[in-house]
Amino acid sequence: MPSTLAVFLVLGLGLSQRSSTQKQMLSKPAIWVRPSFMIPKGRSATIGCRGAGEAMEYQLHFEGGLSALKRPKSSPVMNWVKFPIPAMTSHTAGQYRCSYRSGELWSELSDPLELVVTGLYDTPTLSVEPRSEVTSGENVTFHCQLATATSTFFLLKKGRSSRPQLRYGNLRAEFHLGPVTPAHGGTYRCFGSYNNHAWSFPSKPVKLLVKVPGDAGDTTFAPTEHTSSDYWDSYELTTGTQSQKDHLLWNHMIQNLIRLGLAVLVLVALMGFLLEDWLHRRKSQERAHRASRRGCRRRLRAQRALET
């Protein structure tokens, strides 16, 4: 009986210590990304992680594995760190979490942060039925189509709080909205997806206007959304600027190739001239050598004839 009591005491002590350790675990940090969770291929982004209390060290986890370590600056006001992503690719897109350490204790992992790389492969087309201007209470359908082989599509409305809608289809998908209200008004784009974190270029924008009938006639409501010039505007600016840069780079590359080709032609021609001159000199030297040998033989024969 005493031995059994001792076993229960040991088990109880262990459970108590484990419970105490769990209670001492730090609260999970906050994680975010700038400028947006959708990042065009090649563009940079920054992941932020903020812990509570005196955080001494931060860890960034990518797809379940440890990605980076960082210590915050010695400032009590900015108790957070930044993890930069220099250039977004399909290899850096995915799910991120972060954690922090204070003393000997580590926090829980943060909520997941899903980063998506866009600008891969082709561009889908987006249309709306029955029309882009409708009356409140009607039903509308967005059609997103992509020629390449994909069965996953996302529809996204411009706005800070907008979340993408997911649909599946064979090269195309339908997004049904309705009955619509003025809150549905706004600018929409769609994407084709090759996996959850690799999206196509965005479609051209389609603007939906929702009218509300009133006593004084129909009133068209502008989109009641708090838009920001983060992803949407900067994407158009960046892709336009990038296309100009690509065009200039391509022209510069073509010019360099032309110059290189001309230089090669000049070098080949020069080598041809040098080779021809070398062959001409060699033939002249061989003819002179043969003539000299023939002259020597004639002199030897004449000398022998005189001796005899």
UniProtKB/Swiss-Prot annotation:
One Gene Ontology term, aspect cellular component: plasma membrane
Regions that span the bilayer: 260-280
Tissue expression: Selectively expressed by NK cells.
GO biological process, one term: immune response-regulating signaling pathway
Ig-like domain: residues covered: 34-118, 124-207
Membrane topology note: Single-pass type I membrane protein
Entry's localization field: Cell membrane
Keyword annotations: Cell membrane, Disulfide bond, Glycoprotein, Immunoglobulin domain, Membrane, Receptor, Repeat, Signal, Transmembrane, Transmembrane helix
Cytoplasmic side: 281-308
Protein family membership: Belongs to the natural cytotoxicity receptor (NCR) family.
Physiological role: Cytotoxicity activating receptor that may contribute to the increased efficiency of activated natural killer (NK) cells to mediate tumor cell lysis.
Complex and partners: Interacts with CD3Z and FCER1G.
This protein's name: Natural cytotoxicity triggering receptor 1
Origin species: Bos taurus (Bovine)
Gene assigned in the entry: NCR1
